[in-house]
UniProtKB/Swiss-Prot annotation:
Biological source species: Homo sapiens
Positions marked as site (Breakpoint for insertion to form FCRL4-IGHA1 fusion protein): S17, A18
Pfam families named among the record's database cross-references: ig, Ig_2
Motif ITIM motif 1: chain residues: 449-454
Glycosylation sites: N374
Impact when changing Y463F: Loss of function, phosphorylation and interaction with PTPN6 and PTPN11
Effect of Y493F: Loss of interaction with PTPN6 and PTPN11 and partial loss of function and phosphorylation
Sequence motif ITIM motif 2, location on chain: 461-466
Domain of life: Eukaryota
Signal peptide (from-to): 1-19
Protein name per Swiss-Prot or TrEMBL: Fc receptor-like protein 4
Length: 515
């Protein structure tokens, strides 16, 4: 129902304060025309009376003005003229004109009739002499003729009922009696309200108070009214309420438009609305765009998160933040929100992410760019050593597996040679003259690390050496001889290349070389 969250402000019906209200005279019986000799009671209303207070009455006739002081707030009168009353400290009331007539037929009407009231007109004959029929005219036109009721009732009176009224009475012997003319003017219950705003050109993010002001007449100051508020003729800002004020806690540029309010009686028979009021919400352009990082200073750690923070010093409304890298045309990210700052997270930063970054902010006046911030990426301590250690370990394990496979192969061949002695083709060739009768399989295998660089650069190698020695029958018994002293030594080199952190493929290459 509401475009944004609105709060109703509690306030009395707009108008004058109670101290400035005029007193109001009420008449009993409630007419303004009487026959001579009749008595009428006037009451001065509109303020609180105390026993010791008195009321001043003013009576103006053709001979002048007469003052009467009464101990209470009532006065009994029998003379024609204008009557006013005044209490201590109050202004004079509006005048009430009374007419005491000597005619045989009078038209009686109430002192005041307001729009929405029922207008009652009474055709009255002196001394209660009977009438057989009554005719009412309005501006010379016959309004009604009745032989049952001498009163005329006009419900829901309005200004359309203003005019000159008269009644004509008919007696038993076809006598005709004509009353005085009575001009009736229906009074306005309240004027069209006026919508007021604390600021018709507010800045975005501020509040605006709206008030729907109208004024009830003193005679009807106790009439309850309901109020509501609209925008652009359709958007309802509030339901009907007895409070004539509305607070808009926060306004934005889209809240600009034509505002108006309505006031009506509780019964809803009188409804009026105010002229429109244009409200233009002002937007402050963004300025002071700044790009920062978390961690601060543009110092990022490889593998960890980097947060790019884009902020503005000023600017209201929806702001679109966009992050960019100098060597890229496309935006890294974009966010639109009502705030002075926004964040973009880069989950795992890498060396390739180093470079110049900047951001822009735009709240419909065009993008404003920040200064370029240089982001550097440093390696995580221990990251390179870990890669080297892993590469070296992998190389050694590969060499060890190769040695085990070679021993197993020789064992299988030796076992096969025993079981097939009759097969000449499967026996090894006989040794030549002067040659020792050696086994073709090594008797001992030694794995030795030749070189490990704990701080390799890109392309560094890790070498491992596998030495195999073939022993004769005599030499097998002599275990004190070193492997490197044997002339028949087989050396296997294993080359392990380690990966530099920039190698995104994450591969470690290796190459075996036998000599």
């Amino acid at each position: 129902m509401l475009l944004w969250a609105s709060l109703l402000a509690f306030a009395p019906v707009c108008g004058q304060s109670a101290a400035a209200h005029k007193p109001v005279i009420s008449v009993h019986p409630p007419w303004t025309t009487f026959f001579k000799g009749e008595r009428v009671t006037l009451t001065c209303n509109g303020f609180q009376f105390y026993a010791t207070e008195k009321t001043t009455w003013y009576h103006r006739h053709y001979w002048g003005e007469k003052l009467t002081l009464t101990p209470g707030n009532t006065l009994e009168v029998r003379e024609s003229g204008l009557y006013r009353c005044q209490a201590r400290g109050s202004p004079r009331s509006n005048p009430v004109r009374l007419l005491f007539s000597s005619d045989s037929l009078i038209l009686q009407a109430p002192y005041s009739v307001f729009e929405g009231d029922t207008l009652v007109l009474r055709c009255h004959r002196r001394r209660k002499e009977k009438l057989t029929a009554v005719k009412y005219t309005w501006n010379g036109n016959i309004l009604s003729i009745s032989n049952k009721s001498w009163d005329l009732l006009i419900p829901q009176a309005s200004s359309n009922n203003n005019g000159n009224y008269r009644c004509i009475g008919y007696g038993d012997e076809n006598d005709v009696f004509r009353s005085n003319f009575k001009i009736i003017k229906i009074q306005e219950l309240f004027p069209h309200p006026e919508l007021k705003a604390t600021d018709s050109q507010p800045t975005e993010g501020n509040s605006v108070n709206l008030s729907c002001e109208t004024q009830l007449p003193p005679e009807r100051s106790d009439t309850p009214l309901h109020f509501n508020f609209f925008r652009d003729g359709e958007v309802i800002l509030s339901d009907w309420s007895t409070y004539p004020e509305l607070q808009l806690p926060t306004v934005w540029r889209e809240n600009s438009g034509s505002y108006w309010c309505g006031a009506e009686t509780v019964r809803g028979n009188i409804h009026k609305h105010s002229p429109s009021l244009q409200i233009h919400v002002q937007r402050i352009p963004v300025s002071g765009v700044l790009l920062e990082t978390q961690p601060s200073g543009g110092q990022a750690v490889e593998g960890e998160m980097l947060v790019l923070v884009c902020s503005v010093a000023e600017g209201t409304g929806d702001t679109t933040f966009s992050w960019h890298r100098e060597d890229m045309q496309e935006s890294l990210g974009r966010k639109t929100q009502r705030s002075l700052r926004a964040e973009l997270e880069l989950p795992a930063i890498r060396q390739s992410h180093a470079g110049g970054y900047y951001c822009t902010a735009d709240n419909s006046y065009g993008p404003v760019q920040s200064m370029v911030l240089n982001v550097t990426v440093r390696e995580t301590p221990g990251n390179r050593d870990g890669l080297v250690a892993a590469g070296a370990t992998g190389g050694l394990l590969s060499a060890l597996l190769l040695a085990v496979a070679l021993l197993f192969h020789c064992w299988r061949r030796r076992k096969s040679g025993v079981g097939f002695l009759g097969d000449e083709t499967r026996l090894p060739p006989a040794p030549g003259p002067g040659e020792s009768s050696h086994s073709i399989c090594p008797a001992q295998v030694e794995l030795q690390s030749l070189y490990v660089d704990v701080h390799p650069k890109k392309g560094d190698l890790v070498y491992s050496e596998i030495q195999t020695t073939q022993l004769g029958e005599e030499e097998e018994a002599n275990t004190s001889r070193t492997l490197l002293e044997d002339k028949d030594v087989s050396v296997v080199y294993s080359e392990v290349k380690t990966q530099h952190p920039d190698n995104s493929a994450g591969k470690i290459s290796s190459k075996d070389e036998e000599s």
